[in-house]
Regions:
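Conserved phosphate- and dinucleotide-binding cores of soluble alpha/beta proteins
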Residues: 1-87
Length: 87
């Protein structure tokens, strides 16, 4: 088991974390399923964007870490699912 897992993704659409393939999604799910704390690292362009395969749920992340260019309305929407940290 891991203490913390940090991953990226191709898109976040509502509570779905997406990537381009089943294989990539399954491989990213392994460390997430085995971590005590889960963090998603994405730039602000990934919000409201979907890709082929939903591999994880945003509710299962302790926080999303993103840049400070995120639109305030988008930030407010996604804070309903988890903590959003801007840097």
């Amino acid at each position: 088991r891991y203490t913390k897992a940090f991953i990226g993704c191709n898109g976040i659409f509502n509570s779905g974390i997406t990537t381009y393939s089943l294989e990539e999604g399954e491989s990213q799910g392994i460390p997430l399923d085995n971590a005590k704390n889960r963090y998603l690292l994405v730039d602000s362009t990934k919000f409201n964007r979907s890709d082929f395969y939903i591999f994880y749920d945003l509710f299962n992340f302790d926080a999303v870490i993103t840049d400070n260019e995120i639109d305030p309305d988008v930030l407010k929407h996604y804070e309903e699912y988890t903590t959003i940290v801007t840097v």
